[in-house]
Amino acid sequence: MILEYQGLIIRLPNNRIKAADLTEETLRQILALGAQLERQAMRALPQDAMLAGGEMLQHRTLRTVLPYPLHRKLLESIQETYIAFAVSARPAPVNDRLPRLLMLDRQGSPDVPDAWNTYEEELLHLILTIRSQYAGTETH
């Protein structure tokens, strides 16, 4: 039931299930939606707020400030399913990325969209790399 809720499996009319077809484009769209919600959350943070702790704690902190429950639930699903998978695949922790994005956003930097895109691409690459290792295929 949890995997179905997360969109990882699809229940068929005969009550059987099959794995969802998670293409690179689908994963890209999911991460873009998560990034959009996290950018919205960054703007909702109090000016003196800081993002501390490990990378996943920082993501979870952002989720708590979203005012609309549906947005919080969507972001929770994206964070706990896809982002957590990518973060756990890192060879070493990266705990400064979200605080840097927050700083750029607060400064009104024109580099914010490119910085978010770079972060999304990094997460996507981690997901695709691990997925290809499980499937026994190569990824670029």
Q: What does each model-found stretch correspond to?
A:
Residues 38-57:
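Helix-turn-helix/homeodomain-like alpha-helical modules used for DNA recognition
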Residues 12, 71-75, 112-114:
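Short, hydrophobic secondary-structure boundary micro-motifs
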